[in-house]
């Protein structure tokens, strides 16, 4: 029987917290003027690589998102060194940053469902109006 919550998942969870603190307190890059949230971290089994998924507060502007990811990639060495000081790991993983659009996509889907439910309620209240269309 395999472990359901192994070491890579535990390290990823702790790393997510530490990276969020580092981004909030230590990174002073003007390209990251918008609020950055670490939504998840995926670790490789050997703990040598980490995919860091981030979201931005003003993520409607695609150019700002690309600049934010680029700034994080360029600061990954600095973030990695601070991470090494904060966590006791034999190998500090190589960090790769990705934009996590699942939150935006989830909000879009929620809005679609809300609109469909509202439209359905309107049709139930006024059944004659829908037949005239």
UniProtKB/Swiss-Prot annotation:
Location of this chain's protein in the cell: Cytoplasm
GO terms for cellular component: cytosol
A molecular function (GO) term: ribosomal small subunit binding
Primary location: cytoplasm
InterPro entries xref list: KH_dom-like_a/b, RbfA, RbfA_dom_sf, Ribosome-bd_factorA_CS
Top-rank lineage group of the source organism: Bacteria
GO biological process: maturation of SSU-rRNA
Keyword entries, A-Z: Cytoplasm, Ribosome biogenesis
Transmembrane segments: none
Function summary: One of several proteins that assist in the late maturation steps of the functional core of the 30S ribosomal subunit. Associates with free 30S ribosomal subunits (but not with 30S subunits that are part of 70S ribosomes or polysomes). Required for efficient processing of 16S rRNA. May interact with the 5'-terminal helix region of 16S rRNA.
Family statement drawn from the similarity comment of this UniProt entry: Belongs to the RbfA family.
Quaternary structure (record): Monomer. Binds 30S ribosomal subunits, but not 50S ribosomal subunits or 70S ribosomes.
The name this protein goes by in its record: Ribosome-binding factor A
UniProt organism field: Salmonella newport (strain SL254)
Gene giving rise to this polypeptide: rbfA
């Amino acid at each position: 029987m395999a472990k359901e919550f192994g070491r890579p998942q535990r390290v990823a969870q702790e790393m997510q917290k530490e990276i969020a603190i580092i981004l909030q307190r230590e990174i002073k890059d003007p390209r990251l003027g918008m609020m950055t949230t670490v939504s998840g971290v995926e670790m490789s089994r050997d703990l040598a690589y980490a995919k860091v998924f981030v979201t931005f507060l003003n993520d409607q502007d695609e150019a700002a998102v690309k600049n934010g990811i680029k700034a994080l990639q360029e600061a990954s060495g600095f973030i990695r060194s601070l991470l090494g000081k904060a966590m006791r790991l034999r190998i500090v993983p190589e960090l790769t940053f990705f934009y996590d659009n699942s939150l935006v996509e989830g909000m879009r889907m929620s809005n679609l469902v809300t609109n469909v439910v509202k439209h359905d309620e309107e049709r139930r209240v006024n059944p004659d109006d829908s037949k005239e269309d």
